């Protein structure tokens, strides 16, 4: 198991990457178009459901990132799984500060943040990370949040 100092250093290093990797939670979907080139994604796929669409991208590391977009064009959820963490600062936007605060109080265990305005789950270990985040007020009517994974 990694020491908390090393884990915190890894989190800071990942979040300090020089490129924006993803559309931002709670923001307009328009930034997704440039994501593939910025994150050097090796594959991109979009799928439309009746109440939302999902944009999937695979990073060169093999990490899969999914962005869930409401019909109004707002990113209401993001999810990731793979050997490396994506750029969480870019993905979570203004919600990133809540994420960082929670990591300082929950070291060495999966992270769970749950409030009326934000839900984040992040866990894993070196070479195997997974998580998701969503904004409950932005989830389209009739969408089960369990699809955000």
Regions found by a protein language model. Give the residues of each.
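N-terminal signal peptide c-region/cleavage motif recognized by signal peptidases
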Residues: 18-21
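Mature extracytoplasmic domains of secretory-pathway proteins
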Residues: 69-106
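Intrinsically disordered, compositionally biased low-complexity regions
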Residues: 3-4, 60, 85-86
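Helix-rich interaction surfaces within compact, conserved domain-sized segments
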Residues: 95-149
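Intrinsically disordered, low-complexity linkers and terminal tails enriched in Pro/Gly
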Residues: 9-16, 36-50, 105-110
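N-terminal secretory signal peptides
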Residues: 24-81
């Amino acid at each position: 198991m990694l020491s908390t100092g090393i884990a915190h250093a890894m989190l800071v290093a990942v979040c300090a990457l020089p490129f924006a990797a993803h559309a931002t939670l709670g923001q307009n979907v328009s930034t997704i178009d440039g994501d593939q080139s910025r994150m050097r994604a090796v594959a991109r796929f979009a799928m439309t459901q009746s109440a939302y669409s999902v944009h999937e991208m695979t990073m060169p590391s093999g990490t899969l990132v999914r962005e869930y977009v409401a019909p109004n064009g707002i990113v209401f959820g993001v999810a990731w799984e793979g050997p490396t963490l994506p750029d969480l600062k870019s993905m979570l936007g203004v919600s990133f500060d809540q994420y960082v605060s929670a990591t300082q109080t929950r070291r060495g265990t999966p992270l769970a943040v749950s409030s009326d305005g934000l839900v984040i789950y992040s866990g894993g270990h070196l070479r195997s990370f997974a998580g998701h985040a969503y904004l409950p007020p932005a989830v389209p009517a009739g969408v089960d949040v369990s699809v955000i994974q």
